[in-house]
Swiss-Prot record:
Gene: bbsG
Entry keyword set: Aromatic hydrocarbons catabolism, FAD, Flavoprotein, Oxidoreductase
pH dependence: Optimum pH is 8.0.
EC numbers on record: 1.3.8.3
Biological source species: Thauera aromatica
InterPro entries per record: Acyl-CoA_dehydrogenase, Acyl-CoA_Oxase/DH_mid-dom, Acyl-CoA_Oxase/DH_mid-dom_sf, AcylCo_DH-like_C, AcylCo_DH/oxidase_C, AcylCoA_DH/ox_N, AcylCoA_DH/ox_N_sf, AcylCoA_DH/oxidase_NM_dom_sf
Gene Ontology terms: cellular component: cytoplasm
UniProt GO molecular function: (R)-benzylsuccinyl-CoA dehydrogenase activity; acyl-CoA dehydrogenase activity; flavin adenine dinucleotide binding
Temperature characteristics of this protein: Optimum temperature is 50 degrees Celsius.
Function per UniProt: Catalyzes the oxidation of benzylsuccinyl-CoA to benzylidenesuccinyl-CoA.
Induction, as annotated: Induced by toluene.
Entry-linked CDD domains: ACAD
Family named by the database record: Belongs to the acyl-CoA dehydrogenase family.
Lineage: Bacteria, Pseudomonadati, Pseudomonadota, Betaproteobacteria, Rhodocyclales
Annotated protein name in UniProt: (R)-benzylsuccinyl-CoA dehydrogenase
Cofactor: FAD
Length: 406
């Protein structure tokens, strides 16, 4: 087993590192200042001019569609290469936050389109998506159903050759974007088993009957909205995949997001550990350097151990994705738990080591702590993932070998 990076991957990682240092790090103060005023003054985390400039630079660098097939307008370098870039960018608050700056296209929804989209859907959406001309949002969560998808109540009923969709969704992102389409999950057969109950539909933002509701502020500067579906009528061309077959592709889509989240976590954890090292060597208490305090030494040692364990799991899971393993639900669930809980602990130690400074917005550590708290809930709560992992292992009736590459 070869753990070394290829020459191309090493170069990609270095280019991403320089981009992060030169373009993203200098904008951190702007992000932290605007984040305080998002909900009162209607700010985005980055000024539009800065966001447009970063988009132009990353497009010229070949960072758009890193993992996307070249036939669809991407770079064709795979999930592992994308992971290396996301990890480097996430050492900055700008790249760490999903609402700071992310590389187009949004990988999970793209994977869903690639896996299940018809030729017509790919022609209409995928290429524009890869070029950054259009964005997408997943529309699954409802007021009464989050991690437990079996509780969804939004329905799509066949009527006069069309699908009529009714229901409401909540905590939906990106609704402030003009050029947007949704992947909406709806119940098409209430009596069917969970895995055959749901169908995915592609809905353009301007589809009649689709209404964007109130904005819902949540911690970590993560804007979300309610969305209402009132007799939304679409044809069969809007069905993504097969009728009644959305459950497994949706779980695989979540798996891609969980790999991506883990890369955000490992990148930022590395940044925080370096901040802890710098502060420990700089600061003294009662005449003794923090670096000589055993508690501080333990914090830094434990953080390093935990980071490298998660990073190895992350790289292995991304590699398996590139090898064609489609069902990575178990790996992705385990990875998301490990990564988000690791960063939670590292951020807490970093705050504690920095004392009052750690609590200030100036350092940005408290922002990380708020963001990672969100990630232990979204894309499947940690408790649900633990339950799923245990259920899989306990009911399969086979020898324990969940992560062995076939």
């Amino acid at each position: 087993m070869d753990f070394s990076l290829s020459e191309e991957q090493t170069m990609l990682k270095e280019v991403a590192r320089r981009f992060t240092a030169n373009e993203l790090m200098p904008l951190e103060k702007v992000l932290l200042e605007r984040e305080m005023r998002m909900w009162t003054d209607g700010y985005t985390l980055l000024p539009e001019a800065d966001h447009a400039r970063l988009m132009k630079i990353t497009q010229e660098m070949g960072f758009w569609g890193i993992e996307v097939d070249e036939k669809l307008g991407g770079q064709g370098l795979g999930m592992f290469a994308k992971t290396l870039v996301v990890e480097e960018m996430s050492k900055s608050l700008i790249g760490f936050s999903h609402h700071g700056f992310t590389l187009p296209p949004d990988a999970p929804n793209l994977y869903y389109l690639e896996e299940c989209g018809s030729p017509a859907q790919r022609d209409k959406y995928v290429r524009r998506y890869c070029r950054g001309e259009i964005d997408s949002a997943m529309m699954a969560t409802e007021p009464g159903a989050g991690s437990d998808i079996s509780g969804l109540t939004t329905t799509a009923v066949r009527e006069n050759g069309q699908w009529v969709i009714n229901g409401s969704k909540i905590f939906i992102s990106k609704c402030d974007k003009d050029e947007l389409f949704f992947i909406c999950i709806a119940v098409t057969d209430k009596e069917a088993p969970t895995k055959r109950r749901f169908t995915a539909f592609i809905l353009d933002k301007d589809t009649p009957g689709l209404r964007i509701g109130a904005e819902i502020p949540v911690i970590g500067a993560m804007p979300t909205w309610s969305v209402y579906l009132d007799n939304v009528r679409v044809g069969d061309e809007a069905v993504l995949g097969e009728v009644g077959d959305a459950f497994i592709p949706l779980q695989n889509r979540f798996g891609v997001r969980r790999i991506e989240l883990a890369a955000h976590c490992t990148g930022m954890a590395e940044r925080l550990i370096q901040m802890m090292i710098d502060q420990a060597n700089l600061r003294k208490t009662f005449g003794v350097a923090l670096a000589d305090r055993q508690t501080v030494q333990n914090w830094i040692a434990d953080s390093t151990i935990e980071l490298e364990q998660v990073r190895l799991q992350l790289y292995f899971t991304a590699w398996k994705s590139d090898q064609g393993h489609k069902d990575l639900r178990l790996e992705a669930a385990s990875l998301k738990i490990a990564a988000t809980e690791m960063l939670t602990r590292v951020a807490d130690r970093a705050i504690q080591l920095h004392g009052g400074l750690g609590l200030s917005r100036e350092m940005g550590i408290e922002y990380v702590a708020r963001m990672v708290r969100i990630w232990r809930v979204v894309e499947g709560a940690s408790e649900i993932h633990r339950m799923s992992i245990a259920k899989k292992l306990l009911t399969d009736g086979r020898t324990y070998s969940p992560f062995v590459a076939a």
